[in-house]
Amino acid sequence: MKCLCFVVLLAILIAQNSSDLGVKSASSDGFVSRKGVQFILNGKPFYANGFNAYWLAYEATDSTTRFKITYVFQNATIHDLTIVRTWGFRDGGYRALQIAPGVYDEKTFQGLDFAIAEAKRLGIKMIITFVNNYSDFGGRKQYVDWAKNTGQNVSSDDDFYTNPLVKQYYKNHVKTMVNRVNTFTKVEYKDEPTIMGWELMNEPQCRADPSGKTLTAWMNEMALYVKSVDSKHLLSTGLEGFYGDSSPQRKTSLNPVAANVLGTDFIANHKLDAIDFASIHSYPDLWFPNLDEKSRLNLLRKWLECHLEDAQNILKKPLILGEFGKPTNTPGYTQAQRDAVFNATFDTIYESAEKGGPAAGALFWHVISDGMNNFKDPLSIVLSENSTTVNIITEESRKLGLIRGKGKLSKTKI
């Protein structure tokens, strides 16, 4: 307990120093760009291991809890994790970023500023998502409700994709985000190389049009708009990766049946010119709960391999596995099962990366700090616990580091 208190105190002091003295980048890293199926950083192929931490801006809104961001980022660097994916939204509700259309809470925005500044200081790249598909933290539903309150004829969350006013709300949010001047670094978000890229939405879906045409049209319009206001950053969709009508065989063999009505199309959505890299997620335990563990592992490998094959041959773009994990509340769960999921995932990513393929990295869901019980769920991981899973994560980071010319490959398992 004394040791933990010391670590927390140290993190607080570091956070205060970052705020008081200004923030300097931990390295001279520039913007991540794309060349064919590879990401490029400072003239070299960029591969990275990473994690999700959706809560960064929320916790950093309160200056007394900002040490949690510092502590998690410091632990991430110990394990050679170099990308974090987080939310660039909180629409309405407690600690909202966007209180009403175009109206922002400065304190919450400064929380996101701090998270970006700390990532910059510690050499971590960020992928930031503009809005949520789900009603958690506002999402599409909140945008539609805002429009409805003005008298717009909207009745479904899927009106988000077609109503002109709602679409303008989204564009306004994008414009506000990219033009934000970070209060710590004094750099506009659109000029900040710490931000690796943006995502249009977290897990976009449109049940009103299972053909996928509505969602593809919306993505095309919004992707072009994002590029018109920020030409420096990469952009992806935030998709789970379910196949659509453009890939009928993949749709039949890989999608869970429930996904066929979600209106997404992995190929069509990512073939858009303004989309720079492919996004997929992987949760076989949630998608196929009735299968046994071995069958789910086989499906996991096939899911990744098929998407990587399509990224290479059809999309000709890099791919990031934006979310994956093993829920601890899965019936019969064991630590060995979670380790097997992480090993299978990382092995597939590494095999592609080693050959110069499109796999750029995997971001597990999700990291929390000690004592963050309000964010704990069946998928959360505390890096400081040094579990066997964390050891597997570290090994993958070091292997990818060897490919990009950093670090050394361990001769033995950690």
From Swiss-Prot:
Annotated Gene Ontology cellular components are: apoplast
Which Gene Ontology terms describe the biological processes this protein takes part in?
A: detoxification of cadmium ion; polysaccharide catabolic process; response to cadmium ion
The glycosylation sites annotated in the UniProt record are 17, 75, 133, 153, 343, 386
Offer one Pfam family short name for this entry. Cellulase
The listed locations are:
Secreted
The entry's active site is: 203 (proton donor), 323 (nucleophile)
- The signal peptide annotation in the UniProt record is 1-19
**Which EC class is the enzyme in?**
hydrolase
* Family matches, as InterPro entries: Glyco_hydro_5 (IPR001547), Glycoside_hydrolase_SF (IPR017853), MAN-like (IPR045053)
Expressed, tissue-wise, as follows: Expressed in leaves, flowers, siliques and seeds.
* Coiled coil is among the record's keywords: no
Catalyzed reactions? Random hydrolysis of (1->4)-beta-D-mannosidic linkages in mannans, galactomannans and glucomannans
**Assigned keywords, A-Z:** Glycoprotein, Glycosidase, Hydrolase, Secreted, Signal
Q: Which GO terms describe its molecular function?
A: mannan endo-1,4-beta-mannosidase activity
Query: Quick one: which residues bind substrate?
Result: 87, 202, 283, 365
- Which Enzyme Commission number(s) are on file for it? 3.2.1.78
Q: Which family does it belong to?
A: Belongs to the glycosyl hydrolase 5 (cellulase A) family.
User: What's the protein name?
Assistant: Mannan endo-1,4-beta-mannosidase 3
